[in-house]
Amino acid sequence: MQNSLLKPRIIEVEVLGAGHAKVVMEPFERGYGHTLGNALRRVLLSSMVGYAPTEVTIAGVVHEYSSLDGVQEDVVDLLLNLKGVVFKLHNRDDVTLTLKKDGEGAVLASDIELPHDVELVNPDHVIAHLTAGGKLDMQIKVEKGRGYVPGNVRRLSEDTNKTIGRIILDASFSPVRRVSYAVESARVEQRTDLDKLVINIETNGVISPEEAIRQSARVLVDQLNVFAALEGTEAPADAPSRAPAVDPILLRPVDDLELTVRSANCLKAENIYYIGDLIQRSENELLKTPNLGRKSLNEIKEVLASRGLTLGMKLENWPPAGLEK
């Protein structure tokens, strides 16, 4: 009788496109496909290190609801386009970059002035369009981070030297755009009750899908090593209690779920602004929402399921302090 657990012996990587791959691993003991697949998926979405614009200062702009003469896009659209620029920093945690452009035409990511240790993954990305006589002058701060951090959490209200016109951005640092997993049947000799784990992952190009999986596995190993070296210790009597940390995925706005306009508007009408707000609602509660029918409900359930979430979940630490509606 064999008492040791099986470890995957077959690992296949199928490249599906730039930054997109399917990774297949088998065999696993029954149940381990879901155990490891879900753990890897959650770490991939929440804990990978990446880079994102976090602050912007634009000449002639006081706040994000302004508009600029000679620029086709308003400031809100310009900032959304800027968030689509993919940066990669080498040997530094933050950098402030300059973008200056005048004259009619498109403003591209490649127009940003870069030092030698900053790289652009998508230099052809369009940031704005200038009309005749238009001009754009901006300072962009790019930082290293993990997951998703809303701007209202990052805002430094105690900063007395704050520059007028500095705009704090919601920062999506994660280099992983999408990840899903499936568990299929596998067979080894006479055993047919084994698992095959299939992970479909897409990144923004800062890291490869294979490297993303390697990094997520290291994060899990590092966390589980604490349990492997578990020793009983008595906690200090006066140790302050801490509120449990909130999963960064729950802090993302419902707009990040890429729902149809109808579904998104129905949710906002019910004051559901964040994914953490949404998952605490039951199916019956959502069906009572005006103009939200069964089709929209099924769409919401499918999108949540693709992220390992469901309706009707209970959160003890929601909403977290400082979260704005």
From Swiss-Prot:
Cystines in this chain: none
InterPro entries assigned: DNA-dir_RNA_pol_insert, DNA-dir_RNA_pol_RpoA/D/Rpb3, DNA-dir_RpoA, RBP11-like, RNAP_asu_C, RNApol_insert_sf
SMART domains, per database record: RPOLD (SM00662)
Key word Hydrolase present: no
EC number(s) on file: 2.7.7.6
Region (Alpha C-terminal domain (alpha-CTD)): 246-325
Summary of the function given for this chain in its UniProt record: DNA-dependent RNA polymerase catalyzes the transcription of DNA into RNA using the four ribonucleoside triphosphates as substrates.
Record's GO cellular component terms: cytoplasm; DNA-directed RNA polymerase complex
Positions of region (Alpha N-terminal domain (alpha-NTD)): 1-231
GO biological process: DNA-templated transcription
Domain notes: The N-terminal domain is essential for RNAP assembly and basal transcription, whereas the C-terminal domain is involved in interaction with transcriptional regulators and with upstream promoter elements.
Name of the top EC class for this enzyme: transferase
Family, as annotated: Belongs to the RNA polymerase alpha chain family.
Protein name stated in the entry: DNA-directed RNA polymerase subunit alpha
Organism: Janthinobacterium sp. (strain Marseille)
Keywords: DNA-directed RNA polymerase, Nucleotidyltransferase, Transcription, Transferase
Family annotation (Gene3D superfamilies): 5' to 3' exonuclease, C-terminal subdomain (1.10.150.20), DNA-directed RNA polymerase, insert domain (2.170.120.12), RNA polymerase, RBP11-like subunit (3.30.1360.10)
Subunit description: Homodimer. The RNAP catalytic core consists of 2 alpha, 1 beta, 1 beta' and 1 omega subunit. When a sigma factor is associated with the core the holoenzyme is formed, which can initiate transcription.
